[in-house]
Swiss-Prot record:
Domain of life per record: Bacteria
E.C. numbers: 2.1.2.3, 3.5.4.10
Transmembrane is among the record's keywords: no
Domain-related comment: The IMP cyclohydrolase activity resides in the N-terminal region.
Cited InterPro entries: AICAR_Tfase_dup_dom_sf (IPR024051), Cytidine_deaminase-like (IPR016193), MGS-like_dom (IPR011607), MGS-like_dom_sf (IPR036914), PurH-like (IPR002695)
Annotated keywords: Hydrolase, Multifunctional enzyme, Purine biosynthesis, Transferase
Catalytic activity: (6R)-10-formyltetrahydrofolate + 5-amino-1-(5-phospho-beta-D-ribosyl)imidazole-4-carboxamide = 5-formamido-1-(5-phospho-D-ribosyl)imidazole-4-carboxamide + (6S)-5,6,7,8-tetrahydrofolate; IMP + H2O = 5-formamido-1-(5-phospho-D-ribosyl)imidazole-4-carboxamide
Protein name (Swiss-Prot/TrEMBL): Bifunctional purine biosynthesis protein PurH
The keyword Membrane appears for this protein: no
SUPFAM superfamilies, per the entry: Cytidine deaminase-like (SSF53927), Methylglyoxal synthase-like (SSF52335)
Length: 516
């Protein structure tokens, strides 16, 4: 027998699912294992004619509060948590007249099944197990001394361990890992359900508070806006124009994030959550707007404009000449709002910038949560990029590449963005392969403005790696002078070879910016 096996002399069993219980109890009883059990589990074992110690006999305290309190007692948990490798623990158990457990068998109240059954709120809450997870976690923590089993499918392993003199340490560790995952999944189910209840309450509350929108993405969809805190697009103050729509809010948020991705004065023009144009300028915010608009004047018609600086009268005059749905900025120069108000329907918003912490997306059966994608990764800094091909870029060219890299984050994947002199000149978005995105970016650069072939001499950013050299080759053939991309493809060497052959500069960031 291995030295690290723990002979099973005493077992604690508390199970909601009684599958396999009879065979397990008979196996333990025939091996002379003392069985301590709770409630209906103890009753079931006793009905089989097997010796069992009810937990209340152990604790000297009756089950109470409709079974809510059964095992939450020091005489139970000390027996589970005592590290029998430590003489001090053994001495304390002896002083307290507590016997240690070597095996804990627990499965939990069927919370997921109760929710799936359509039970009401109180019914679901009643099926949140408290004592069970406490015992499981205690036993898993103390796996050097205790084996914990949470799945009836593993009862055969218990029988085998009893025959072999107990579970060895490696087996107990594996059982502990399984147990911690079991309780973690259980807690996620409970917390997710509670979050859903609160979300439902929030939507209902928002409707009652008058935050309902005219309709959703389409007229047949109901919609509302739930405002939290005092900053960001949701809490923007509207100075003029028609009521904000669901789509207005979506595009305003996309534009707001795109503009604030840049530290320099920036204007982003968005339509259907994709950039028509983004530009920065240290000369003036009006110059940035003119450059952003020039990227794709046709698409900018009816777009949403976001600005990360004060809107000047000069810029307001430019905007007033173009049909614009929404403009959002942190402030407006005296007289700028009056100029914009010359357009009856333009929605003029003023907002305080907020960096989102978490993004939430509803999916069938639940929701996805992730840390918001802002420029926080180390690879987002040009100083950390790796030169993969060609000569190192000049300071001016590197600044162009960094602008393109910051701008491409706001483009729906697959995303290729061409830039020149601090402005986008061609954007390829939302294609299911990177070659088509590259072709689209080049086509838009060369056909959507008065000056032909804007792609030639521009720089390019790709939100993810090129899986083959073909996407890069489209950019090379169009005359792109430098490229920044994450790298990381298994065919990086082919892509690098294509860049080297063309004599262009290419940097790897090591960071990806997918946007779906």
């Amino acid at each position: 027998m291995s030295d690290d096996r723990k002979q099973i002399k005493r077992a604690l069993i508390s199970v909601y699912d009684k599958t396999g219980l009879e065979e397990l109890a008979r196996t333990l009883d025939s091996a002379g294992v003392e069985i301590v059990s709770t409630g209906s589990t103890a009753a079931k074992i006793a009905d089989l004619g097997i010796n069992v110690t009810p937990v209340e006999s152990l604790t000297g305290f009756p089950e109470c509060l409709e079974g809510r309190v059964k095992t939450l007692h020091p005489r139970v948990h000390a027996g589970i948590l005592a590290d029998t490798r430590k003489p001090d623990h053994l001495n304390q158990l002896e002083e307290l007249e507590i016997e240690p457990f070597q095996l804990v068998v627990v499965n939990l109240y069927p919370f997921k099944e109760t929710v799936a059954s359509g039970a009401d709120f109180d019914g679901c809450v009643e099926q949140i197990d408290i004592g069970g997870p406490s015992m499981v976690r205690a036993a898993a923590k103390n796996h050097p001394s205790v084996a914990v089993v949470v799945d009836p499918a593993r009862y055969g392993d218990i029988a085998e361990a009893v025959a072999q003199g107990g579970f060895d340490l490696a087996q107990r560790r594996q059982l502990a890992a399984t147990a911690f995952k079991h309780t973690a999944d259980y807690d996620v189910a409970v917390s997710g359900w509670f979050a859903q209840q609160l979300a439902d309450d929030s939507v209902a509350s928002a409707e009652l508070e008058g935050d309902a929108l005219r309709y959703g993405e389409n007229p047949h969809q109901q919609a509302s806006i739930v405002r939290e805190g005092t900053t960001g697009v949701a809490n923007a103050k509207q100075l003029h124009g028609k009521e904000m729509s669901y789509n207005n809010y979506q595009d305003a948020d996309a534009a707001w994030r795109a503009a604030w991705d840049h530290e320099r004065p920036c204007v982003a023009i968005i339509k259907h959550a994709n950039p028509c144009g983004i530009a920065v300028s240290d000369e003036s915010i009006a110059a940035a707007h003119a450059a952003a608009h020039a990227c794709d004047p046709m698409s900018a018609f009816g777009g949403v404009i976001a600005v990360n600086r004060e809107v000047t009268k000069e810029m307001a005059t430019q905007v007033a000449d173009i049909f614009t749905e929404v403009i959002i900025a942190p402030s407006y120069e005296d007289g700028a709002v009056e100029i914009l108000q010359g357009k009856k329907n333009i929605r003029i918003l003023v907002a305080e910038h907020e960096v989102p912490a978490v993004e939430v997306k509803e999916i069938s059966g639940g929701r996805l949560l992730q840390e918001a994608d802002v420029y926080q990764a180390e690879g987002d800094k040009a100083s950390s990029w790796t030169l993969a091909a060609g000569e190192a870029a000049s300071e001016e060219k590197l600044a162009e590449l960094e602008f393109a890299w910051r701008a491409v984050r706001s483009v729906k994947s697959n995303a290729i963005l061409l830039a020149h002199e601090g402005a986008t000149v061609g954007v390829g978005m939302g294609q299911v392969n990177r070659v088509d995105s590259a072709k689209l970016a080049v086509d838009r650069a060369n056909t959507l403005a008065d000056s032909a072939e804007r792609a030639r001499g521009s720089v390019a950013a790709s939100d993810a790696f090129f899986p083959f050299a073909d996407g890069l080759q489209v950019l090379i053939d169009a005359g792109v002078s430098a490229v920044v991309q994450p790298g990381g493809s298994i065919r990086d060497e082919e892509v690098i070879a294509a860049a080297e052959a063309a004599g262009i500069t290419m940097y790897f960031t090591g960071t990806r910016h997918f946007a779906h």
